[in-house]
Amino acid sequence: MAAARNLRTALIFGGFISMVGAAFYPIYFRPLMRLEEYQKEQAVNRAGIVQEDVQPPGLKVWSDPFGRK
């Protein structure tokens, strides 16, 4: 009985970890692997936006989210 209980716990925990990984893939890992595609998409999305017009005074102006330090 103890082995069945441990297996059930491991399956539930493993399923939870898998679901978290599946949720983070399109949010974090896919943009990192397809950098150029996302840079082009952001250029299209931000075309025609003047940063100074939409940026609240006193805050840092947008920076490239794909830029490396």
Curated annotation (Swiss-Prot):
Keywords associated with the record: Amidation, Membrane, Mitochondrion, Mitochondrion inner membrane, Secreted, Transmembrane, Transmembrane helix
Segments on the Mitochondrial intermembrane side according to the record's topology features: 30-69
One GO-annotated biological process of the protein: mitochondrial cytochrome c oxidase assembly
Stretches that traverse the bilayer: 9-29
Entry keyword annotation includes Membrane: yes
Residue positions, PTM Phenylalanine amide: F66
InterPro entries recorded: SMIM20 (IPR027917)
One cellular component term from this protein's GO annotations in UniProt: extracellular region
UniProt topological domain (Mitochondrial matrix) ranges: 1-8
Tissues and organs where the protein is expressed, per its UniProt entry: Highly expressed in the hypothalamus, the spinal cord, and sensory ganglia (at protein level). Also expressed on in the epidermis and dermis layers of the skin (at protein level). Expressed in preadipocytes and adipocytes (at protein level). Expressed in the ovary, specifically in granulosa cells of follicles that have passed the primary stage and in oocytes (at protein level).
Keyword tRNA-binding carried by entry: no
Record's note on what induces expression: By fatty acids, specifically palmitate, docosahexanoic acid and oleate.
Subunit structure: Component of the MITRAC (mitochondrial translation regulation assembly intermediate of cytochrome c oxidase complex) complex, the core components of this complex being COA3/MITRAC12 and COX14. Interacts with COA3/MITRAC12 and COX4I1. Directly interacts with newly synthesized MT-CO1/COX1.
PANTHER family, per the entry: SMALL INTEGRAL MEMBRANE PROTEIN 20
Protein name: Small integral membrane protein 20
Organism: Mus musculus (Mouse)
Lineage, top ranks: Eukaryota, Metazoa, Chordata, Craniata, Vertebrata
